[in-house]
Design a protein with these regions (language model features):
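Catalytic cores of DNA base-excision repair glycosylases
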Residues: 3-210
Length: 210
């Protein structure tokens, strides 16, 4: 418990007002940006989404988009063929079945092309303020380094353990803080361990401080 309190205090110190770094204006734009961010970076996603939503300003436009044209725009984020098809599929369902509004129901959202549990957690937490902890690569890495989860735990295992340890009213905020902490401090390569007050709890402190 002491470790968790120290982590929460440190995250509040580093990121008192954490913000999602994906650029969006509408609900479906956020959902699509999160889908595009899989196995990519927010920076790359932010380089293509303004182009997408400028060229295709409505869901109907995206639904009718030429797939090859959309693929070329999305190419920088990786897996561009698959992701272009996901975006067209999402636009089509939202336009045809939901009057252009992204549903808040988790099961319905997870039935959309390219939308899994992590994407739903990010979307619901960011857009609607629904308590959720989305476990992306940063959250998973930091959690395992700080022994909040076992090294062989699945993403779902990590999520469930964090939900038990973190107060529910902090879940969405905690997710954003952990993403930023993993992105800028507890990095996959060359983490900034020297001055980290959490290193006493870290599995990798010896390796990264030697």
């Amino acid at each position: 418990m002491m470790m968790m309190n120290k982590l929460l205090d440190y995250l509040d110190y580093l990121f008192p007002n954490p913000k999602c770094e994906l650029i969006y204006q509408k609900d479906y734009q956020l959902l699509m940006a999160v889908v595009l961010s899989a196995q990519s970076t927010d920076k790359r996603v932010n380089s293509v989404t303004p182009i997408i939503f400028s060229k295709y300003p409505t869901l109907e436009d995206l639904k009718k988009a030429n797939l090859s044209d959309l693929e070329e725009i999305i190419r920088p984020v990786g897996s561009f063929r698959k992701k272009a098809a996901f975006l067209k599929g999402i636009a089509t369902r939202l336009f045809d079945e939901f009057n252009g509004v992204v549903p808040i129901d988790r099961e319905v959202l997870e039935s959309f092309p390219g939308v899994g549990r992590k994407t739903v957690n990010v979307f619901l937490g960011e857009f609607y303020g629904v308590p959720a902890i989305a476990v992306d690569t940063h959250v998973e890495r930091v959690s395992k380094r700080l022994k909040l989860a076992y090294l062989n735990d699945s993403v779902l295992d990590v999520e469930r353990k964090l939900m038990k340890k973190v107060p529910k009213d902090r879940w969405a905020r905690f997710h954003l803080q952990m993403v930023l902490f993993g992105r800028y401090y507890c990095k996959a390569v060359k983490p900034l361990c020297k001055d980290c007050p959490l290193k006493e709890f870290c599995r990798e402190k010896k390796k990264n401080l030697d």
